[in-house]
Amino acid sequence: MKDLDRRNFLKLGLLSTAAALSTNSVNAAGSGKDSSGGIGNVPLQKYVAKKYTNLLGGALTGFSDEQLKAHFALYEGYITKINDLEARIKNFDTNNPDTINYRGWHLEQTSMLNGAVLHELYFGNLGAANKEPKGSLKKMINRDFGSLQSFIGHMKTVGKIFHGWSLAALNYRTGKINVYGLERHNLNVPTMVSPILVLDVYEHAYMIDYGTDRKKYLDAFVMNVDWKPVEERLEHALSIPFGEAVTV
């Protein structure tokens, strides 16, 4: 298949997937007044899609509005779907011996939840307003990878060889930053880590602008990283003690 034909084919598939995810939703996990249940914090009753219009209008070099809007629509579909799934799971009668659908909902729940949250982290670390890491982030990158160039090299290499995500995260067990590869939203997901930099390498993230040329997309991503939210995520993660005690 020619690259242009493949690009149009993938574009159509992305838009169709986003539309499918956005249909057949139910009102999410509760419609009454919020209640903390005596715990003190009031939980959200449903997921609400965040807006990333600040990334449009040429704010990102190498990312067209068409590409970004299609990507936003896909993310919004994940939000719709996770609300639907969590409502179905909550309302399931656990005395019902027919658990085939229940199992399917749980399998899909992790995929839709991770799909929603990882996209929020991905869009959140784009913007290019702050082009260099600073403070604790810079020090830890140099400590754990030797240099920013080496760190970026690991992010991009993982992005080349995995189908889903490349993400840097603070490992609570060791206190170090590691780069992890996710084959799917809910496959190869590490535990006891807090993501700080997230890179979407599914074809839907770049196919409109770059077709199958993932290398050019990876270069564009690096050029458009906003390091400020990455620093803020790390500082938040560091506020939680790490080490052997986390697995008590």
Positions of PLM-derived features:
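An amphipathic alpha-helical core segment
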Residues: K156-V225
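N-terminal targeting pre-sequences for secretion and organelle import
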Residues: K216-V248
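Non-transmembrane amphipathic alpha-helical segments
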Residues: Y78, I82-L85, I89, H119
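N-terminal secretory signal peptides and thylakoid transit peptides that target proteins
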Residues: M1-T17
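C-terminal segment of N-terminal export signals and the immediately downstream linker at the start
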Residues: N24-G58
